[in-house]
Amino acid sequence: MKHVPVAAALALFMAAGLASNTGAAPAVGGPVTGDWGFDATGMDTSVRAGDDFFKYANGGWDVRTPIPADKTGYGLDYVLADQAELRVRGILEGAPAPGADGAKIHAAYAAFMDEKRANVLGATPIAPDLAALRAVRTKTEMAALMGRSPMSFESAIFNTGIGVDQKAPDKYAVSIGQGGLGLPNRDYYLQPSFAAKKAAYQTYIVTMLTLAHWQDPQGSAKAIVDFETRIAEASWTRAESRDPDKTFNPMSPAELAKFAPGFAWRPFLNGAGLTGVDRVIVRQNTAFPKIAAIYADAPLTTLKAWEAFHVVDAAAPYLSDAFVDAQFDVRGKTLSGQPSQRDRWKRAVAFANGGMGEAVGRVYVAKYFPPDAKAKIDALVKELVVALGQRIDGLDWMSAETKTKAHAKLAQLTVKIGYPSVWRDYSALKVSAANMAADAEAFDRFEWMRDVKRLHKPVDRTEWGMTPQTVNA
């Protein structure tokens, strides 16, 4: 179904100024302002608002607007994202911005756009990953290799992350959650309604292992799906995993090793570069002993085949068309309902944005968000903060003590508009126009090691969770 805000929001988006959405990269320039006003043609006034408000507000637009073949939904936020995508394309296909970052984002885009080279290389870019996997001789070594998953194409049966400690928001913490599934969630393995998709997934595994020249693709695929099904049975549901209290279980690595034996936790953490970590937050805690036991019980050949498939699956977007097409047929069409693959330039834009989003954003801001526009919005927000303070003062039902606390909370408000005050430093990142698969791993490694290095530092309040070219930034 289409995802669309009600027509009342249309005026806001029209005021934002939408440029023509064509297939060609637009000329790089300044802000573009489109038509102003409320688009009443998006409504369907033949329907009473009280009977069906969605049709009343959006019925005209809904009837006239098909979902593009390369998307699974569409709405005004998608329109804005399409415009930003075209603008970034113009930046990446134009002359590089001065400096090393400008050269790097162009190299990343060029690497992805070189489809001919990708087809010549085939599976060659992942040969080192598969060679390292074939060299594994013990389950302890396998756990160490899985530890590399945040910064490589490798995968793991437990997912590791670094973020703000939810119980101590001035610090960062390492969190570990359940993982190991190649399908979207446990229901795809356990519910009969997903049986066809599970079967398609197993066929997909055969295809990918065959393309990667892994031994016994048919037998390995069955073993992999059986292994993941056992993990699914042990895993928490999505609803359970959203409980902030149940998913906060701090432990030391030694305590975790006793709590969930059967998995080499210290080698796993060392593989992730977390050699000095003495505290981790365990998410779905009751699943951990079960998943660790499943790992301990699995043959090493199954674990290696499982890892091989997930390496290929993670790397597929950066390999030859055979890998790309096989992945899209299952992950795009079968699992997501997306009829057509996105154009290569769109995927290349996403690649550059994903790897060096702030470097792209810095150029984007210079082209499309002039300082005077930011100054005006900053001034407007300051007035809103003042007005909010005045509203607090005028509340009859709020006590003086509560008002004091409300003002203290208001004073701590951090306003972030348009782009960060401190841009990310990409000087340590190496990018090559000749190897997009290596670039993809370099992007992951750069971000992960950046997180590891700041683990014992205070939380950076200036950091942004999105790039300037992201809709809603």
Region annotations inferred by a language model:
Residues F259-G262, I281-N285, F309, V349, ...:
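Intrinsically disordered, low-complexity linker/terminal regions across diverse proteins
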Residues P31-V32, R48-V120:
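Active-site-surrounding "flap" and adjacent substrate/cofactor-binding loops of secreted or lumenal enzymes
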